[in-house]
Amino acid sequence: MTFSVLLLAFLLRILSTSHLAQAQSVAPPAKLSVHWEELTAADFREGIHRSQGTCLLPFGILEKHGPHLPLGTDLLDVRYAALHAAEQEYAIVFPEYYFGQIAEARHEPGTVAYSREMQLALLQETTDEMARNGCKKVIIVNGHGGNESLLPYFAQTQLDKPHDYVVYVFDRRSPESGGPAKKTTIDMHAGESETSKMMIARPDTVHIDRAATESGADQHRQNLPEDVYTGIWWYARFPNHYSGDGSAATQELGKFQMDWWIDAVAKAIRAVKADDVSLKLQNEFYEKSKHPLDTQP
């Protein structure tokens, strides 16, 4: 009798252990923060594995945004979009980065404008260090219009020498159409769209009552053809570093545009994770560039 009881207890223990193991094996993975700076070293390792080595570098700036938005608007907006996108499609998001191109706003208080040498060197060091830590797919998510030439140029210069990682640039911040009707036609900086998005990302920093205290109108102080570029073009048109009318902003427009942005970044993350061609082509290119005379059509 005693033997039967012991045998039954033994079998029940094995069965319960088996069920526990099965439950643990099908349990969803533990939630990991998408914030680089919030992860422990061990969790960072797991995050790299879970993200398939895909990391985001949200790129902002410190500059005046009209009379009503904070200096860090671009950084606050792009990080809001990137962090929410990474929650949808897991990726590790690098901490605050604002070391970009903003020479055109050096006359305004609070602007931090680094030299072109520093911008490129620091960005290269940053992506190199991200890759050394396992981020073999670095997506730079741009939040600042003044970086629109800098970032593609930086990505192109990655062909200068071999790298074991790929730099991708994502530079769409608003949909071309759809959503609530806009009230303004000029809307390039701190205007209706950007103010609306900040009403979603950081409404506590928006001073909508100040939006009409300065002019965001185009001053048309140059008379050059559209295809003739000069660095002073922005200051010539918008000397107040304000383009548009932020007082027209609404939360409805902000939610539509921010939701679109988050979804677009999430789609970009998925596409980059699935990309198994770019690094192979980079390596092929590096090898061929050593012996250009051997390259055949």
Regions found by a protein language model. Give the residues of each.
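Short intrinsically disordered, low-complexity coil segments enriched in acidic
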Residues: 1-3, 63
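Bacterial N-terminal signal peptides
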Residues: 3-18
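Extended, histidine- and acidic-residue-enriched regions that form the cofactor-binding/catalytic faces
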Residues: 24-117, 121-137, 145-297
